[in-house]
Design a protein with these regions (language model features):
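Acidic/His- and Gly-rich active-site-bordering loop/insert found
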Residues: 19-125, 135-152
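Extracytoplasmic/secreted proteins, especially bacterial periplasmic and envelope-associated proteins
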Residues: 21, 28, 32-35, 39, ...
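Soluble non-cytosolic domains of exported or imported proteins
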Residues: 27-31, 44-55, 127, 131, ...
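Divalent metal-coordination and catalytic microenvironments
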Residues: 40, 79, 92, 130, ...
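Metal-dependent amide/peptide-bond hydrolase catalytic core
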Residues: 63, 244-435
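Hydrophobic beta-strand positions in extracellular immunoglobulin-like domains
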Residues: 81, 223-225, 291
């Protein structure tokens, strides 16, 4: 009995020593992570154009002695870190791309970058926090490379381009990375990822088991009318009027035909184009938009009704219209067993009081493509300054997050990786997620 007590004390001492070493590494890396984040914020690049971002990431990984592969899915970077002992393979993912948004923030590291997007010169900004994701994962790579002796297995660092969507006519993002074999050689057993959130206080982690973020689809509606003089609408068929009726009708599908007590659904028209002059009723109009759903049956019903409604409304006003729907991302599905397995780690790192279960959100994430292949866990990291009552929404010129929240992301991904690799549990994706 006494020997068992001595052994327990020795093991406890080793664990404390190991944690103390990690804590020192975290302290040493924090300023670097903030510096990297600010560099990437000041030098953003659009989807599939993350050339300099990828170059800086690859340079850092190589300096750590990590095996590096570049050019995956255009600009993607993958690093492979093998531990002291063989074992499972865990992947960690960060997205790299920025958005065509002109920054309004008055920051010392404000983006003044511009680029061409869909034929127009636009401002470029990390308006969704991908700069923080890259910096965090670079920090995790450095901490883990200093602690290879603690790693039983392999860590694969995935720096992904084009999460916001590839430019028209191009492939990209997580789907292309999967297609090009990013989860193979070595085969990944589980994948973790995070997203900074400007409406969650620094120090907090939010999560959900099961369906967490919505499936996203893109729709294009083409309306054909009959051109006429603006002073004689009776001699033509007005595609702008038809478009207005269609937009109104689409919202009734959500409000009157979907059971929103089960799951949320959203139809948003994001762009409408028609006409060239104030006194000409044009021949045609076009609309594009997004659909968000968290239930596959609801998604199928909504798609069917959209196509029917667009056509019948146009016919009712003497015109024609078609609705084409394409897939963008699947439901982001957190594997319940993996969530249960990793929650103690997150609570240890963030504190139980700062680890909060949340409801599903209608935002979408192409991290879902990885989760279709292997069990995954995607969570939200607080980025709102403590005490603030005002947040800065994602995808806007005013978006901002507090750098002081980044270190928690480094700690969470580092210790989730170590705990997962050192555990005997390996949840399997026996059946692909169905919402």
């Amino acid at each position: 009995m006494r020997k068992l007590g001595i052994l327990a004390m020795l093991l406890c001492g080793i664990a404390i020593q190991a944690q103390s070493r990690l804590d020192k590494d975290y302290k040493d890396i924090e300023d670097k992570v903030i510096e990297w984040r600010r560099y990437f914020h000041e030098h953003p690049e659009l989807s599939n154009r993350e050339f300099k971002t990828a170059e800086k990431i690859a340079e850092h990984l190589k300096s750590l002695g990590i095996e590096v592969e570049t050019g995956i899915a255009h600009t993607g970077v993958v690093g492979i870190l093998k531990g002291k002992k063989p074992g499972k393979v865990v992947a960690l993912r960060a997205d790299m791309d920025a958005l065509p948004v002109t920054e309004r923030n008055d920051l010392p590291f404000k983006s003044n970058a511009t680029s061409e997007y869909m034929g127009e010169e636009v401002g470029v900004m990390h308006a969704c926090g991908h700069d923080t994701h890259v910096a965090i994962l670079m920090g995790v790579a450095e901490v883990l490379s200093k602690n290879k002796d603690k790693i039983k297995g392999t860590v694969k660092f995935i720096f992904q381009p084009a999460e916001e969507g590839a430019p028209p006519g191009e492939e990209g993002g997580a789907a292309l990375m999967v297609k090009e074999g990013v989860l193979k050689n070595p085969d990944v057993d589980a994948i973790f990822g995070l997203h900074i959130n400007s409406q969650t206080p620094v120090g907090m982690i939010r999560y959900k088991s099961g369906g967490t973020m919505a499936a996203a689809q893109v729709f294009e509606i083409k309306v054909k009318g009959k051109q006429s003089h603006g002073s004689q609408p009776w001699s033509g068929v007005d595609p702008i009027l038809i478009s207005a009726k269609i937009i109104d009708g689409l919202q009734t599908i959500v409000s009157r035909e979907m059971n929103l007590t089960n799951e949320a659904a959203v139809i948003t028209v994001g762009k409408i184009s028609a006409g060239v002059r104030s006194n000409i009723i044009p021949e045609s109009a076009e609309m594009i938009g997004t659909i968000r759903t968290l239930d596959y049956d609801m998604k199928d019903k909504l798609n069917k009704r959209m196509v029917e409604m667009v056509s019948t409304i146009a016919q009712a006003y003497g015109g024609e219209a078609t609705c084409t729907i394409t897939e963008a991302t699947d439901i982001t599905y957190n594997h319940p067993e993996l969530v249960e397995q990793m929650l103690p780690t997150i609570k240890r790192v963030a504190g139980a009081e700062n680890t909060v279960a949340q409801k599903a959100v209608t935002g979408a994430e192409d991290f879902s493509y990885f989760q279709r292949e292997v069990p995954g866990f995607f969570f939200f990291l607080g980025g709102m300054t403590p005490g603030n009552t005002e947040s800065y929404p994602h995808h806007t010129p005013d978006f901002r997050v507090d750098d002081s929240g980044l270190l928690l992301g480094v700690k969470a991904l580092t210790e989730m990786s170590l705990d997962y690799l050192n555990s005997n549990k390996t949840p399997r994706l026996d059946v692909k997620p169905k919402g």
